[in-house]
Amino acid sequence: MHNVHLPQNIINRLIMKRGKVEIFDSLDPAHTALVVIDMQNAFVAQGATLEVPVARDIVPNINELTAASRETGAAVVWVRITVAKSGPNAFLVYHQNFFSPDKAARHQAALAEGTESNALYAELDI
């Protein structure tokens, strides 16, 4: 999603620590899952309440990864944040302490169960 460049000194430290950059030499599809998080309309759709414009840029990559994962037999898991009206899934501490009241209300409404903004972005190959 973001253009990230690891400085060479960090890469060198990884190599010193484990002898290589990559953690795994290969992945066993039977024991592997691609987990896709926060690709809901609330974050991805143009003009959405919680829009992250660069999220749309990674949709083609996600679709390629999901196709490759399915082709090899790896699981594909889609994670949606859903905010309930009450109870532990209302994220009350989060909304009361990290947002102004109006921003909290917008966040809660955008991620409410059954809303279009809570649905996964339509251009994803689900």
Model-derived features with residue positions:
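Active-site acidic carboxylates
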Residues: M1-E123
